[in-house]
Amino acid sequence: MQTIKCVVVGDGAVGKTCLLISYTTNKFPSEYVPTVFNNYAVTVMIGGEPYTLGLFDTAGQEDYDRLRPLSYPQTDVFLVCFSVVSPSSFENVKEKWVPEITHHCPKTPFLLVGTQIDLRDDPSTIEKLAKNKQKPITPETAEKLARDLKAVKYVECSALTQKGLKNVFDEAILAALEPPEPKKSRRCVLL
């Protein structure tokens, strides 16, 4: 059975672990536990063929900047996550996350993933952002960044309501299996 390695990166507390737990168990975790490094595996059927989707969670906190790239070798696709209600996490996509993964894995495809979309219409979240003269990130703004950074595409979801959640992983699988170049040369290799 072919394995697809999918590594999830992004700032701390944008919902990377919730995304993975909600997708793999259909349950939303009730408390925040910062991640050091976790992985999950699910079997998915694509075109009648079974694949193992290996999902690798990473810690977004700066303390792990030197440790995190150890999970990058052999990655088939990255999910670069930001919260649609955290402008700083969106900014870090281009300032930190895409430079980091493209430095280590220049040929590996990545998707830009907006998380926590259920909070985009939440009055108290909107009010908090407004106090700092900020507002939620719109899909159009994120799609433009995805194009500018040469992401495969922009997708968004809510791990809480599961809206768009399955689509994130379906698109990740498609990106990993897309054959623009021979498969072997697209996997991440640390030299």
UniProtKB/Swiss-Prot annotation:
InterPro entries with a match to the protein in the record: Cdc42, P-loop_NTPase, Small_GTP-bd, Small_GTPase, Small_GTPase_Rho
Localization per Swiss-Prot or TrEMBL: Cell membrane; Midbody; Cytoplasm, Cytoskeleton, Microtubule organizing center, Centrosome; Cytoplasm, Cytoskeleton, Spindle
Disulfide-bond pairs as recorded: none
PTM field: Phosphorylated by SRC in an EGF-dependent manner, this stimulates the binding of the Rho-GDP dissociation inhibitor RhoGDI.
Residue ranges of the propeptide: 189-191
GO CC terms in record: centrosome; cytoplasm; lamellipodium membrane; membrane; midbody; mitotic spindle; spindle midzone
GO molecular function, one term: GTP binding
Keywords: Cell membrane, Cell projection, Cytoplasm, Cytoskeleton, Differentiation, GTP-binding, Hydrolase, Lipoprotein, Membrane, Methylation, Neurogenesis, Nucleotide-binding, Phosphoprotein, Prenylation
GO annotation, biological process: actin filament organization; anatomical structure morphogenesis; cell differentiation; nervous system development; phagocytosis, engulfment; positive regulation of cytokinesis; positive regulation of pinocytosis; positive regulation of substrate adhesion-dependent cell spreading
Topology with respect to the bilayer: Lipid-anchor; Peripheral membrane protein
SMART domains with a match to the protein in the record: RAB (SM00175), RAS (SM00173), RHO (SM00174)
PTM sites of type Cysteine methyl ester: 188
Catalytic activity: GTP + H2O = GDP + phosphate + H(+)
Motif (Effector region): 32-40
Positions with a binding annotation for GTP: 10-17, 57-61, 115-118
PTM-bearing positions, type Phosphotyrosine: 64
Subunit structure: Interacts with CDC42EP1, CDC42EP2, CDC42EP3, CDC42EP4, CDC42EP5, CDC42SE1, CDC42SE2, PARD6A, PARD6B and PARD6G (in a GTP-dependent manner). Interacts with activated CSPG4 and with BAIAP2. Interacts with DOCK11/Zizimin2; the interaction activates CDC42 by exchanging GDP for GTP. Interacts with DOCK9; the interaction activates CDC42 by exchanging GDP for GTP. Interacts with DOCK8 (via DHR-2 domain); the interaction activates CDC42 by exchanging GDP for GTP. Interacts with IQGAP1. Interacts with NET1 and ARHGAP33/TCGAP. Part of a complex with PARD3, PARD6A or PARD6B and PRKCI or PRKCZ.
Function, in words: Plasma membrane-associated small GTPase which cycles between an active GTP-bound and an inactive GDP-bound state. In active state binds to a variety of effector proteins to regulate cellular responses. Involved in epithelial cell polarization processes. Regulates the bipolar attachment of spindle microtubules to kinetochores before chromosome congression in metaphase. Regulates cell migration. In neurons, plays a role in the extension and maintenance of the formation of filopodia, thin and actin-rich surface projections.
Family stated for the protein in its record: Belongs to the small GTPase superfamily. Rho family. CDC42 subfamily.
Name listed for the protein in its UniProt record: Cell division control protein 42 homolog
Encoding gene (name): CDC42
